[in-house]
Amino acid sequence: QGHEIDPMAVNGLEQALQIALTTSQFYRAEEICDLLIMDDPVNLELLETMRDLTLYNGNYEKSLEIVGKIEKLKGVDSNLLIQKSALYEELENPGLALETMYIAFEQDSQNVDILHRLVTLLIGQERSQEAIIYNQRIIDNHPNDSRGFINNAVMAMSGKKPEEAIQVLQPHEERFSQDFTVQYLLGTAFYQIKDFINSKLHLSKALSIYPQSRNTKHNLALIHDSTGDWVESDKLYIDLISTDSTDAQAYNNYAYSLVERDRDFEFALELAQNAIRLEPKSAAYLDTIGWIYFKMNNFDEALRYIRESLNIDSSNETIKEHLNEVIKVRAKVNGQAIQQVENQD
């Protein structure tokens, strides 16, 4: 039984809801929708609007409550169970998220969305053997759905087996030539085994499918760096920085690329300073700025930053090599300076 509200007031609230939705005042819309549901608690359209609003506003506890009400009116279906599972995951309850998907699987064991969601949760909870079993159902029953092959590749990559990921995806690359994730994973796997030609090929395809992918641009820039194609890597770094002034990784990688080429030390230093400003406790970024100071013969600053970097990541071999190089060169330069003074005397 709903609370009785004057019909004129209901009409006014409905108009207010439409205005709030049209003007993107979603928190206000949620408040108004809540009032309307109090008057008409079995109005499915209102409940679905409320669910969408609470999801957008990140009010996941409320979303879960609303999905439960929708479920009572419509009955249990796979989409609602998937939504409930996703909400449990957002609310950091992985056990209930998985339990909900087992219920969904019992109701429809061939549904590819249920299977994929189940596999994704199992991978996330490091239950790879179970994930493999359910994922095989996707491959067997839905061979034209790329997600089964992608899941196997993701598990291989998670296990640091890029060659296995390539073996999983490469036989199907033509069939999924316009699938961003397939091309991206192939490019990343080839990059990890230092096959830069194939890596560049697949990541370029991925970028053509989804030009806004920043991860793809980052990886392509690293490959162009590795192959000495610096015109292309510089273009990508400039694009990344110009489209997101908070991309610390782009600042750092561009700076490191320049200093490794012995180019534009002042500009590289400016880039590295931006990276440090954004992420002051990053061992990699502290090492980069220290290495730039070393190349600029400012050994004291170089030592300060690289030692700080090593304190954060004491097992990093590159940072250790940089520190040893700075100490060695500084000792040599200081020795030469002392020798010159003695010769003058």
Where are these regions (language model features)?
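Alpha-solenoid helical repeat scaffolds
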Residues: Q1-D345
